[in-house]
Each structure stands twice: as C-alpha cells, then as structure tokens.
Amino acid sequence: MSMLSLHQLQLNIEKRNLFDLCITFLPSAITYIKGANGSGKSSLLRMIAGIMQPSSGNIYYKNSHINNCQKPYCTYIGHNLGIKLEMTVFENLKFWSEIYNSTETVQAAIHYFKLDYLLDKKCYNLSSGIQKVVAIARLIVCKSDLWLLDEVETNLSKENRDLLNNLIIMKANSGGIILLSSHQESVIKSAQILQLK
C-alpha cells in the first residue's frame, strides 16, 4: 500500500522545536499544511522529498525508508520551480518525462494546460504565472503517486487554479497522496488540514 508515514519527525532551528510529527497519510489523502510563516511548512515538504534532512525521526513511503526508495519516488514543486529557463516549454516537459520514463504523457500535459501555443517559447520569455503552469504540468508528465506542492497556486490565474485543483482531485481518486502548503483557504472539500504551530 502506498502509505506515507512520518515517525517522530522533528525540525529544530536555533534550539526551537518547530514540529514533532507522528502521522500516516493513506492513499487518496489530500492534506493542506497550514501554519504561520516560519512554522516549517516548506521544510516539511523538502524533508519528505528527500531534499532536506530532519533533525531527528524517519520518513517511510510504501513501507521503505525514503533513503531506500527508488528515485524519483515523488513529484515536488517548490518555490524554485525546477524549470530550465533557457529551454523551451516542450523541452522542459520532455526533459522531465525522460527522467520519469513517461514520454507518452507529454501531449496529455500540453493539452490539459492548453500549452500548445507556447511549446517553442523559451521559458525565460514567459510570465511568472505561465512559468508556474509549465512547472505544474510536470504533475501529469511525471508518473508518481506522491505529490508535494509548496504554495503552487501563487501567481496562477483562476482558470489554472481550477485546473490544478481538478488534477489534484483526480490524482487522489486514483490513490495518490497529495500534500500542499498554502496560505489560501482549501477549496477541496475532501482535504484534511495539518496545522503546524
């Protein structure tokens, strides 16, 4: 089963314990991570993605410690969008599809987010909102059942926010686990809230 478990996961900064978490996320879970600035929302997502080490504790996905999971085991989109600005929109999507061995999904991502007219554009020529759309199109391109999304709705138009929310619901309905940090109110009624102090 594709469970995600945090076992006594702690983050200590300047002798302050930001969180101490013991929690399991089951398949089809959508969880909004809430908390004030500096409460550790982004750090928690980075830990689960394997980018940052916790102060103590362990993270397990599909019953394996994340250090032993075959990479890439998740799709993480943070403040650094992970797009290559000197490459075109199509080249970026193709690049990610090759990492995840999922080249057949590129056209689906292009169609879903209506990117056809931008395929040959270099990403440095795009607005911050469209760069964000290219980044979240990876959610279709990259075949993973664990999505970690750090304030991805920022700079998105209402249309693209709606497309993103529908995509999240579809992923959850197919058994995926989605964790999102957000300053906005949850518009997904089935979502649960993880509140960091």
From Swiss-Prot:
A GO cellular-component term linked to this record: plasma membrane
Subcellular location as annotated: Cell inner membrane
Gene3D superfamilies on file: P-loop containing nucleotide triphosphate hydrolases
Record-listed ATP binding positions: 35-42
EC top class, as a word: translocase
Domain spans labelled ABC transporter: 1-196
Alphabetized Pfam families for the sequence: ABC_tran (PF00005)
GO molecular function, one term: ABC-type heme transporter activity
GO BP: any one term: cytochrome complex assembly
SUPFAM superfamilies (alphabetical): P-loop containing nucleoside triphosphate hydrolases
Keyword annotations: ATP-binding, Cell inner membrane, Cell membrane, Cytochrome c-type biogenesis, Membrane, Nucleotide-binding, Translocase, Transport
Catalyzed reactions per annotation: heme b(in) + ATP + H2O = heme b(out) + ADP + phosphate + H(+)
Highest taxon listed in the record's lineage: Bacteria
Annotated EC: 7.6.2.5
Membrane topology: Peripheral membrane protein
Role of this protein: Part of the ABC transporter complex CcmAB involved in the biogenesis of c-type cytochromes; once thought to export heme, this seems not to be the case, but its exact role is uncertain. Responsible for energy coupling to the transport system.
NCBIfam families on file: ccmA (TIGR01189), PRK13541.1 (NF010063)
Assembly mode: The complex is composed of two ATP-binding proteins (CcmA) and two transmembrane proteins (CcmB).
Similarity-based family: Belongs to the ABC transporter superfamily. CcmA exporter (TC 3.A.1.107) family.
Protein name (database record): Cytochrome c biogenesis ATP-binding export protein CcmA
Gene: ccmA
